[in-house]
Amino acid sequence: MRGGGNMQQMMKQMQKMQKKMAQEQEKLKEERVAGTAGGGMVTVTVTGHKEVVDVEIKEEAVDPEDIEMLQDLVLAATNEAMNKADELTQQRLGKHTQGLNIPGM
């Protein structure tokens, strides 16, 4: 049974890390990040779980003659917000997996 204590210690560390990561995931639900486009004419806000919670469109962004521009602005703001959510998740969870070679983390 050599090395059994080492394995037990490693399992305890993994359980501790799992618990911390679960807590961070819970916090991410509440965190908000925003993406903007068109100089702030469109703002999309998402949670750390990438759930869209708000879309703001300033009046000057609405041109009935150019709906495609508004669509592009909404798309760009959404993509920026999603990228920020990914970065936030990496910051929060990455500190717990640093130095570990876990696929997908």
UniProtKB/Swiss-Prot annotation:
SUPFAM superfamilies: YbaB-like
Entry similarity comment: Belongs to the YbaB/EbfC family.
Protein's name according to its UniProt entry: Nucleoid-associated protein SERP0115
Species annotation: Staphylococcus epidermidis (strain ATCC 35984 / DSM 28319 / BCRC 17069 / CCUG 31568 / BM 3577 / RP62A)
Residue ranges of the region described as Disordered: 1-40
Keywords: Cytoplasm, DNA-binding
GO cellular component: bacterial nucleoid; cytosol
Bias (Low complexity) ranges: 7-16
